[in-house]
């Protein structure tokens, strides 16, 4: 970590000249499975890809940018997810923002979770569709909003909607909550809607086989019409994918602005995803999935035992710690950093004004010694800043098993 300083009340930042950098326990990055490492099989294969294919293709996929490695990547993603086909693009944010307007258009109705990611919100705005929002992860309210809008029809003409979509995430990045997917699939089938599932924070990190939320609930992946995910979290790379039926993917290959116009994903990035994904399917990567689950549960339960208010699902690798007051975000992050623990503070507009928080992201690369050291520091910082707000300490007097 290096220190940043500001001379204009935090309108801009620069790296401090006195900062030499220091080693920290990283609790802020999305390196869920620890594949973003400087050595090992993934790194070696990525370096080999550079020697064979170079650093960049300097051409869009529809011109001269498609190579064998891209075809292998897309077939690997489809196999990993258990669907017919997949399309990959070079930027995770654009996977939502530029593909949603190609799938959803004017005259369509979208029922969207109120805490969906900014990339989804922007993509839906660009689509021109009518968007109705339901309370976070509340399937009863989802069905109420869906039924009401179907009955009313288009607000201007009263005519039936062209198509109806439900858009949700697998794991919500600020809440650590997990989508109630079985119930949403049941609603989708009942009303004849299409389901768009963003698995950016769940693919690789959730489920006994690391296949995401669909795997976590042991559901049929074909019950989800459009599967979206990114390679920037669990796979330690860049870019994202849309997966589903062959007809959908063939359509996107012809129409998607995220596929047609940008330069193709570089070979080492594509190879990083292939190697890490195949490691989960056929190698020792599955052990990382189990390690992440163990680390996440242990870290969450220890924080609850200390008296912190923790949001999210017990199985989620995203662990928000409530700070509530804006001033305590900076104090908490800097105090942790002073003791060599790097974390992320989150405030408005990413969260409500009254729900400021620190967000921890666990990794399979964390050892128990690292986690215990970080927990000891967080415990002391919590006492120092008086942020142990919970009125009941869970697991009081018990030994949390690792």
Task: Give the positions of each predicted feature.
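Conserved PLP-anchoring active-site segment centered on the Schiff-base-forming lysine
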Residues: 99-118
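Conserved N-terminal alpha-helix of the aminotransferase class I/II PLP-enzyme fold
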Residues: 43-92
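Eukaryotic N-terminal low-complexity, Ser/Thr- and Lys/Arg-rich leader segments
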Residues: 1-12, 151-159, 384-402
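Active-site phosphate-binding strand-loop segment of PLP-dependent enzymes
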Residues: 30, 132, 136-197
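Active-site C-terminal subdomain of aminotransferase-like
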Residues: 191-194, 201, 206-306, 311-315, ...
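N-terminal "arm"/small-domain region of PLP-dependent enzymes with the aminotransferase-like
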Residues: 1-55, 193
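Conserved PLP-binding catalytic core of the aspartate aminotransferase-like
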Residues: 1-5, 286-300, 304-340, 348-350, ...
